[in-house]
From Swiss-Prot:
The gene is cca. Keywords: ATP-binding, Hydrolase, Magnesium, Metal-binding, Multifunctional enzyme, Nickel, Nucleotide-binding, Nucleotidyltransferase, RNA repair, RNA-binding, Transferase, tRNA processing. Residues 228-329 form the HD domain. This is Multifunctional CCA protein. It comes from Shigella sonnei (strain Ss046). The keyword Endoplasmic reticulum does not apply.
Amino acid sequence: MKIYLVGGAIRDALLGLPVKDRDWVVVGSTPQEMLDAGYQQVGRDFPVFLHPQTHEEYALARTERKSGSGYTDFTCYAAPDVTLEDDLKRRDLTINALAQDDNGEIIDPYNGLGDLQNRLLRHVSPAFGEDPLRVLRVARFAARYAHLGFRIADETLTLMREMTHAGELEHLTPERVWKETESALTTRNPQVFFQVLRDCGALRVLFPEIDALFGVPAPARWHPEIDTGIHTLMTLSMAAMLSPQVDVRFATLCHDLGKGLTPPELWPRHHGHGPAGVKLVEQLCQRLRVPNEIRDLARLVAEFHDLIHTFPMLNPKTIVKLFDSIDAWRKPQRVEQLALTSEADVRGRTGFESADYPQGRWLREAWEVAQSVPTKAVVEAGFKGVEIREELTRRRIAAVASWKEQRCPKPD
């Protein structure tokens, strides 16, 4: 029996990144031998065991052969005669096909070290094409390591295109697509994930609502980048700088979906694109089974981001109604989330990356004023039932009006 550290732990250590999880491969052993040594078996489809002390995963060396369509139909073979090189060959990228023995020596049969040094994401073998999930994984790795200068090897991108055009991605379940997307949204450059999907044709298959935005023009006066698809990726990049929250980043990604519905004869203007985009947000989220909380914020951002841009023009009643519409009284975090997504929208434009966004400050200030109106005082004044809400709203509007006159007067 020989044990090797494999995969991501070696890759990240060589890149100087924190190592979160360590995975091990066991060569020349059997399930019974692992159980006799005190390991606990956890894998159903192939032999994976937990170490009795560290609880890290130890997998018997195995090979995989595609036996059907999609990414789940694989026949696994795990036996003592499977070599380390055999096991590493089934992995997706060369930088993940590295192993390290107990002396610290790195085994690199597929030039993963060279690709790591050259910042290349390259597939190990043609077997890459048997698993459509790998298209998403490579896009996610591209986003994760973009800040280090990584790019996808030409031959790998070509293979990803071939897989997409062959219809392989249609076998992916919504849950897996969302899981990879959610992981990509946590990276430093989530926009790279969607750009890679577009480069290989997968965006049109998995995110047609986003793909439809490319080639749709917006007024050059407000959008020097012109193309709404490019603007969408720029806003996502900006959102990633402003917030680590997946729901903020996803909502920003979806904020302009309604522009994809504008008839070409009305271009480059997109009146009413916000409310129009709400149905597309719901459609996308239902298809990918996006969690409700993330979906709900995306709907609100699509509907109200343009309203927040015009904040100085809003009367106090409209401002308080906005807080009602986003359910801010029960979910106050939505005010901050709307401020951040709207700021990302404004700064996600060519030449506006460092722009100030006072509307965000005014939104936050107006919220502090509105929520500081005490409910207790209304009740103590003798109001009852529905009168309480009506009087509370009236007082909130009055408080916001007083604040607005001093801090955010309506332009002449």
